[in-house]
UniProtKB/Swiss-Prot annotation:
Binds 1 [4Fe-4S] cluster. Keywords: 4Fe-4S, Cell inner membrane, Cell membrane, Iron, Iron-sulfur, Membrane, Metal-binding, NAD, Quinone, Translocase, Transport, Ubiquinone. GO terms for cellular component: plasma membrane; respiratory chain complex I. It is found in: Cell inner membrane. NDH-1 shuttles electrons from NADH, via FMN and iron-sulfur (Fe-S) centers, to quinones in the respiratory chain. Couples the redox reaction to proton translocation (for every two electrons transferred, four hydrogen ions are translocated across the cytoplasmic membrane), and thus conserves the redox energy in a proton gradient. The gene is nuoB2. Belongs to the complex I 20 kDa subunit family. [4Fe-4S] cluster binds at C37, C38, C102, C132. It catalyses: a quinone + NADH + 5 H(+)(in) = a quinol + NAD(+) + 4 H(+)(out). Its EC number is 7.1.1.-. This is NADH-quinone oxidoreductase subunit B 2. One of its GO terms (molecular function) is NADH dehydrogenase (ubiquinone) activity. Its cofactor is [4Fe-4S] cluster. SUPFAM superfamilies: HydA/Nqo6-like.
Length: 159
Protein backbone atom coordinates (compact mmCIF):
# COMPACT_ATOMS: atom_id res chain seq x y z
CA UNK A 1 0.00 0.00 0.00
CA UNK A 2 1.28 3.39 -0.94
CA UNK A 3 1.50 5.99 1.82
CA UNK A 4 -0.09 9.36 1.05
CA UNK A 5 2.35 12.16 0.28
CA UNK A 6 1.58 15.85 0.64
CA UNK A 7 3.01 17.98 -2.17
CA UNK A 8 4.05 21.62 -1.92
CA UNK A 9 0.74 23.06 -3.12
CA UNK A 10 -1.32 21.11 -0.59
CA UNK A 11 -2.32 18.23 -2.87
CA UNK A 12 -2.53 14.74 -1.45
CA UNK A 13 -1.38 12.10 -3.92
CA UNK A 14 -2.52 8.56 -3.15
CA UNK A 15 -4.75 5.76 -4.36
CA UNK A 16 -8.48 6.04 -3.71
CA UNK A 17 -8.72 2.87 -1.60
CA UNK A 18 -5.81 4.06 0.57
CA UNK A 19 -7.59 7.35 1.15
CA UNK A 20 -10.88 5.56 1.96
CA UNK A 21 -9.12 3.29 4.48
CA UNK A 22 -7.44 6.28 6.11
CA UNK A 23 -10.74 8.16 6.43
CA UNK A 24 -12.63 5.04 7.58
CA UNK A 25 -10.12 4.30 10.34
CA UNK A 26 -10.52 7.79 11.80
CA UNK A 27 -14.31 7.82 11.59
CA UNK A 28 -15.62 4.67 13.27
CA UNK A 29 -19.31 4.72 14.15
CA UNK A 30 -20.02 2.03 16.69
CA UNK A 31 -23.08 0.13 17.84
CA UNK A 32 -23.10 -0.94 21.48
CA UNK A 33 -24.38 -4.40 22.31
CA UNK A 34 -24.13 -4.50 26.09
CA UNK A 35 -25.31 -7.75 27.63
CA UNK A 36 -23.86 -7.64 31.16
CA UNK A 37 -21.50 -5.76 33.48
CA UNK A 38 -18.97 -5.00 30.71
CA UNK A 39 -21.52 -2.58 29.30
CA UNK A 40 -20.98 -0.32 32.33
CA UNK A 41 -17.29 0.02 31.41
CA UNK A 42 -18.28 0.63 27.80
CA UNK A 43 -20.55 3.49 28.93
CA UNK A 44 -17.71 4.88 31.04
CA UNK A 45 -15.41 4.92 28.00
CA UNK A 46 -17.96 7.02 26.11
CA UNK A 47 -18.35 9.50 29.00
CA UNK A 48 -16.41 12.72 29.41
CA UNK A 49 -13.34 11.31 31.18
CA UNK A 50 -12.24 9.09 28.29
CA UNK A 51 -14.40 10.57 25.50
CA UNK A 52 -14.27 8.19 22.55
CA UNK A 53 -15.58 11.03 20.37
CA UNK A 54 -12.12 12.59 20.20
CA UNK A 55 -10.92 9.45 18.39
CA UNK A 56 -13.67 9.93 15.79
CA UNK A 57 -15.90 7.23 17.27
CA UNK A 58 -19.55 8.17 17.49
CA UNK A 59 -22.24 5.88 18.97
CA UNK A 60 -25.12 4.94 16.70
CA UNK A 61 -28.47 3.40 17.59
CA UNK A 62 -29.11 1.83 14.20
CA UNK A 63 -26.99 -1.02 12.77
CA UNK A 64 -27.45 0.46 9.30
CA UNK A 65 -25.40 3.49 10.34
CA UNK A 66 -22.67 1.61 12.23
CA UNK A 67 -19.26 0.36 11.07
CA UNK A 68 -18.42 -1.44 14.29
CA UNK A 69 -20.30 -3.49 16.86
CA UNK A 70 -18.91 -3.85 20.39
CA UNK A 71 -20.20 -7.03 22.05
CA UNK A 72 -19.85 -6.73 25.83
CA UNK A 73 -21.12 -9.45 28.13
CA UNK A 74 -22.39 -13.02 28.18
CA UNK A 75 -23.84 -14.05 24.84
CA UNK A 76 -26.56 -16.65 25.33
CA UNK A 77 -27.88 -19.10 22.76
CA UNK A 78 -31.20 -17.26 22.79
CA UNK A 79 -29.52 -13.94 21.98
CA UNK A 80 -27.24 -15.36 19.24
CA UNK A 81 -29.76 -15.12 16.36
CA UNK A 82 -30.58 -11.53 17.33
CA UNK A 83 -26.95 -10.40 17.30
CA UNK A 84 -26.39 -12.19 13.99
CA UNK A 85 -29.38 -10.37 12.49
CA UNK A 86 -28.03 -7.05 13.75
CA UNK A 87 -24.61 -7.84 12.31
CA UNK A 88 -26.14 -8.73 8.93
CA UNK A 89 -27.93 -5.36 8.85
CA UNK A 90 -24.63 -3.48 9.10
CA UNK A 91 -23.11 -2.14 5.88
CA UNK A 92 -19.79 -3.44 4.56
CA UNK A 93 -17.05 -3.10 5.72
CA UNK A 94 -18.07 -4.01 9.25
CA UNK A 95 -15.99 -4.83 12.29
CA UNK A 96 -16.56 -6.62 15.60
CA UNK A 97 -14.90 -6.09 18.98
CA UNK A 98 -15.43 -8.74 21.65
CA UNK A 99 -15.16 -7.07 25.05
CA UNK A 100 -14.64 -9.05 28.25
CA UNK A 101 -14.16 -12.66 29.28
CA UNK A 102 -17.82 -13.55 28.80
CA UNK A 103 -17.95 -12.27 25.22
CA UNK A 104 -14.56 -13.81 24.42
CA UNK A 105 -15.23 -17.33 25.67
CA UNK A 106 -18.17 -17.52 28.04
CA UNK A 107 -16.34 -16.35 31.16
CA UNK A 108 -17.73 -17.62 34.46
CA UNK A 109 -20.72 -19.07 32.65
CA UNK A 110 -18.70 -21.07 30.09
CA UNK A 111 -20.13 -24.45 31.16
CA UNK A 112 -23.73 -23.27 31.37
CA UNK A 113 -26.16 -24.91 28.96
CA UNK A 114 -27.45 -21.57 27.70
CA UNK A 115 -24.17 -19.77 26.91
CA UNK A 116 -22.79 -19.50 23.37
CA UNK A 117 -19.17 -19.75 24.70
CA UNK A 118 -17.85 -16.77 22.83
CA UNK A 119 -19.20 -14.42 20.21
CA UNK A 120 -16.60 -15.65 17.72
CA UNK A 121 -18.85 -18.67 17.18
CA UNK A 122 -21.54 -16.31 15.89
CA UNK A 123 -19.63 -13.33 14.42
CA UNK A 124 -16.17 -12.84 12.87
CA UNK A 125 -14.31 -10.99 15.64
CA UNK A 126 -11.55 -8.52 14.73
CA UNK A 127 -10.32 -7.47 18.20
CA UNK A 128 -10.54 -9.30 21.53
CA UNK A 129 -10.37 -7.27 24.75
CA UNK A 130 -9.63 -9.45 27.82
CA UNK A 131 -10.71 -8.78 31.39
CA UNK A 132 -13.59 -9.23 33.76
CA UNK A 133 -14.73 -6.54 33.29
CA UNK A 134 -12.11 -4.84 31.12
CA UNK A 135 -11.36 -1.25 32.01
CA UNK A 136 -12.33 1.71 29.88
CA UNK A 137 -8.63 2.14 29.05
CA UNK A 138 -8.55 -1.42 27.68
CA UNK A 139 -11.53 -0.66 25.45
CA UNK A 140 -9.86 2.50 24.15
CA UNK A 141 -6.67 0.53 23.52
CA UNK A 142 -8.67 -2.06 21.55
CA UNK A 143 -10.35 0.66 19.50
CA UNK A 144 -6.97 2.23 18.71
CA UNK A 145 -5.66 -1.21 17.72
CA UNK A 146 -8.60 -1.58 15.33
CA UNK A 147 -7.77 1.81 13.82
CA UNK A 148 -4.15 0.72 13.38
CA UNK A 149 -5.31 -2.55 11.82
CA UNK A 150 -7.31 -0.60 9.24
CA UNK A 151 -4.35 1.67 8.44
CA UNK A 152 -2.03 -1.30 7.85
CA UNK A 153 -1.46 -2.39 4.26
CA UNK A 154 -3.24 -5.61 3.32
CA UNK A 155 -1.15 -8.76 3.10
CA UNK A 156 -0.61 -9.90 -0.48
CA UNK A 157 -0.21 -13.62 -1.01
CA UNK A 158 1.51 -14.50 -4.28
CA UNK A 159 2.52 -17.84 -5.69
Amino acid sequence: MQTPTLHGDGFLLTRLDTLCDMVRSNSMWYLTFGLACCAVEMMQAAASRYDMDRFGMIPRASPRQADLIIVAGTLTNKMAPAIRKIYDQMAEPRYVISMGSCANGGGYYHYSYSVARGCDRILPVDIYIPGCPPTAEALLYGLIQLQNKLKRPPAVIAR
